[in-house]
Amino acid sequence: MTKSKSGLSFLWLSAVTFLLDLSSKYFVVKNFELYESINILPVFNLTYVRNYGAAFSFLADHDGWQKYFFIVLAIAISLMLCYFLAKNQATQKLQNIAYALIIGGALGNMIDRLYHGFVVDFFDFYWDIYHYPVFNVADIAISLGAGLMILDAFKNRHEPEQRTE
């Protein structure tokens, strides 16, 4: 019986995502003051903010328990997705890429929470006075991974079998 490569071969993408995320956050923390903003395009700024919650600052205004909740959640999701990668064949590229991106992003934000107690965000898109919530490389990876999982679910849907009577 021939052994085929598993989806774990995609963990290099998690490592690249993780390193890009941490290096971009390091750059922002070292070169920006808190809330400092540099205009890049008419609809885009680099703005250093601290996020004590999750996406869209969900749970940010609580007493600090959410930090530990999100750390445990990131570990649990990353372990679960590593298990899925181990079970997947390397040929399941879309799903493996999705899992790897989510793992890299989850671990990047988790390290921020462990080290700083918050997540460093800096991509600030806006139109006129309306700003989209500020985000980071890890958030992009998690969102892309989730989108690819949805795409993969639609791509792999099978037509229901027709019953003959």
From Swiss-Prot:
The protein's location, in the record's own words, is: Cell inner membrane
Record's keyword terms, sorted:
Aspartyl protease, Cell inner membrane, Cell membrane, Hydrolase, Membrane, Protease, Transmembrane, Transmembrane helix
Documented EC number(s) = 3.4.23.36
Q: In which pathway does it act?
A: Protein modification; lipoprotein biosynthesis (signal peptide cleavage)
Q: Name one GO biological process term.
A: proteolysis
What's its membrane topology?
Answer: Multi-pass membrane protein
Q: List the record's Gene Ontology CC terms alphabetically.
A: plasma membrane
Q: List the disulfide bonds.
A: none
Q: What does this protein do?
A: This protein specifically catalyzes the removal of signal peptides from prolipoproteins.
Stated name of the protein: Lipoprotein signal peptidase
Question: What is the organism of origin for this protein?
Answer: Pasteurella multocida (strain Pm70)
